[in-house]
Every structure is written in C-alpha cells, then in structure tokens.
Amino acid sequence: MNILREHAQTIIDDTLKQVQPHAAVQRALEGCTFPGKCIVIAIGKAAWTMAKAASDLLGNTIDHGVVLTKYDHSQGEIPGFIIAEGGHPLVDENSIAGTEKILAAVENLSLIHI
C-alpha cells in the first residue's frame, strides 16, 4: 500500500470510529453532570448501542430507561432498561407496544425533571 493510500485509510478508519453510536454517545455525555437520577430513552436502529454507552458511562446515575429498536438489533439486557423491539421501516404491534412503554416511563415527568 502506498503512503497516500495508507493516510486515506487511516482517515477513513478514524472517521468511522468517531461516528459509531457508542463512541458518539460517550463523547456527548462525557463531563455531563445531573442533579439527580436520569431517565434514558433510546429509539432507532442504534438505540441499544446508544443506551449501552449511556449505561456504561453514567452507571447508577440512570434511574431507568427504555430502548425501542428494530428487530434483531438488541444485544441483550442492559441493567435498569426495558428493551423493546418493533417493526422497521413499517410500524407493527410491537412498535406500538414499545412506544407505550416509553410513554409510561415518562408520563409522570414534569418541567422540574428537565
């Protein structure tokens, strides 16, 4: 591999690492402080990975959380989280059930919780 190709590959590899959901969430939350416990809601194809990153970084700061992701995108349990999978790109009954779990998780929140 010539030197230009090596440099290009290094740039590509580093860029891809930076946009990975786990790394992006950890970068976004690093240094954040919360006055109390927080609730984490993660939705989408990368939701499980993002929630796991938040859990890894924030630990006991998280009171609870809900993940709603596409079928077969969950990689197992995350302590304190409800994991729900649903249809994508078409909504199905499990998508709706997952959305209801999210609504239940936040229904008693008010502006004081923000």
Predicted feature locations:
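A glycine- and small-aliphatic-rich helix-loop capping segment at beta-alpha/alpha-beta transitions
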Residues: 53-64, 78-82
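Short glycine-rich or small-residue beta-strand-to-loop segments that form or flank ligand, phosphate
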Residues: 37-43, 83-86
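Glycine-rich, flexible beta-strand/loop modules in the N-terminal catalytic cores of phosphate-handling
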Residues: 71-91
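Short internal beta-strands
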Residues: 65-70
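N-terminal glycine-/serine-/threonine-rich phosphate-binding loop
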Residues: 1-39, 48-57, 71, 89-110
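Conserved small/polar residues in nucleotide/adenosyl-binding loops
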Residues: 112-114
